[in-house]
Amino acid sequence: MLSSRAAAFTGRRLASTLPPVPRKKSHGVRRLLAKAVVATSLFYAGGLTLSAYNDKANELFVEHVPFGEELVERWEDWTSLRRPGRRMIDARRVDEISRDFRAAATPEATPVVVRPLVQLQLPELQMQGSSPVLEALVNNVNDVVVALNARALELPEDTASALSSVYGEIVHSIQALNASLDQEFATEVESRTGKAISSVQEQLEVEYKQRELALAEQYIQNFEVFKSQLQKATAEQLETELKAHEQALLARHRNEVAQLSIRQVEEFNKIIEKKLDQERNGRLAKLSELNSAVESLAPVLDRLELRAVKNECVTQLSTLISDIQGKLSRGGDEPLDLSSDLQRLTLLADILPRPKRCCSEGPALLDVAMAELQAKAQAPVASNEQLYNRWQLLQPELKTTSLLPPNAGFLGHLTAKLFSMLLFTKEGFSTTQDMDAVTARIAENLRLNKLDCALEEAVNMKGWSRKSADAWVDLARRRLEVLTLLDVIEAEVKTL
């Protein structure tokens, strides 16, 4: 047991007095973790050794230290595997000692050495400015120390001194670890701070250069924009001033020209007045008599002009009326539109000078005839050929209507239609008053262009025959009225 304790203490001292690993300037976090692992291993090794020789320490280590129970169990299993050889050696020594005791007649009493016991009091670990990892380790160590001091363990003096020395070495190692960590942390902070400062300086220099380039480019752009705007504004202002100056010069030139022309006119008037004054008593002495003679000729010239205008209007009116009558006499297969001719006729009638009315207050015959002609010629006027053709188409119906009895019904109409087919169509002039003779006379008058006689015969018809011929009578009456009005206007124009 003593040899195993000595071996354990020796291993712990060797483990606690191992030289520190030389530091490297790089990998500070790795060194920090390695030192934390070493300190934790030393702490667990010391606690495991103490728990192997003291039950109270064993109980505190198992209850308060994480993974303490598992480590103690593994330690006991490992020691149990090493003990069988020693048990055999101890059994042999016990047999030898028992044989020696039996051989001795009177056994000698071995003195019992009583070693004084000392109460174990370990100081708490004080650490300031440690890292969070070491601070947790220090807190765990202080918890174990407080628990050991609370148990008031009484140990032999050499054991207590050995534990105190081991604890002191652990404290020294933790403090050295803390100091090295602080130094490495300061070194690492300084190196990283230098790197950060250098990188920040480089970044600031790059940003400064970029900002300087951007500002220079922006300044150039703003300068170019300002330059273009200034050039544009200057050009516009210069153009405006040039235009204003040009306008002022033109106005001044016009004023000077106007003044010069006024002076020239005044001088010319003076010259004319002077010449007139000179000639007034000479060749222009009878100028007033000449003026009165010219004034006496003015009414004669007006009358001549009025007569010429009247003759021209009468000539054009006669020509236009002759043209309209020629159109109506020529005829054709389509109705005649006289609107344009009537507009010209009305215009000439308005221009025509006429004598003043002295006896009658009513409108002149020419105006009445023109108004009636405008009213009658609004619709197209049928030609003589159209009237003749329409009358030829109307004759069979007139034959049928002439055979109808009074109040004829359907049978009467049918009978009249059949008998009308048996009648012979008369031609030429006939003196009888039957329907065939009347239609023959009307057709002959139309053929001979005697529209008034034909219309008179048609108007004198009675009954269904007159009713059937109403449309033809209207067309013939419109043509006859237009021709009559043209004759009236022509006669009135000839009397002017």
Curated annotation (Swiss-Prot):
The chain crosses the membrane at residues 36-53. Residues 1-14 form a transit peptide. It is a single-pass membrane protein. One of its GO terms (cellular component) is MICOS complex. It is found in: Mitochondrion inner membrane. Residues 15-35 are mitochondrial matrix. Residues 216-261 form a coiled coil. Keywords: Coiled coil, Membrane, Mitochondrion, Mitochondrion inner membrane, Transit peptide, Transmembrane, Transmembrane helix. The keyword Coiled coil applies. Pfam families: Mitofilin. GO terms for biological process: cristae formation; protein import into mitochondrial intermembrane space. Residues 54-496 are mitochondrial intermembrane. The keyword Membrane applies. Component of the MICOS complex, a large protein complex of the mitochondrial inner membrane that plays crucial roles in the maintenance of crista junctions, inner membrane architecture, and formation of contact sites to the outer membrane. Plays a role in keeping cristae membranes connected to the inner boundary membrane. Also promotes protein import via the mitochondrial intermembrane space assembly (MIA) pathway. Component of the mitochondrial contact site and cristae organizing system (MICOS) complex. Belongs to the MICOS complex subunit Mic60 family. This is MICOS complex subunit MIC60.
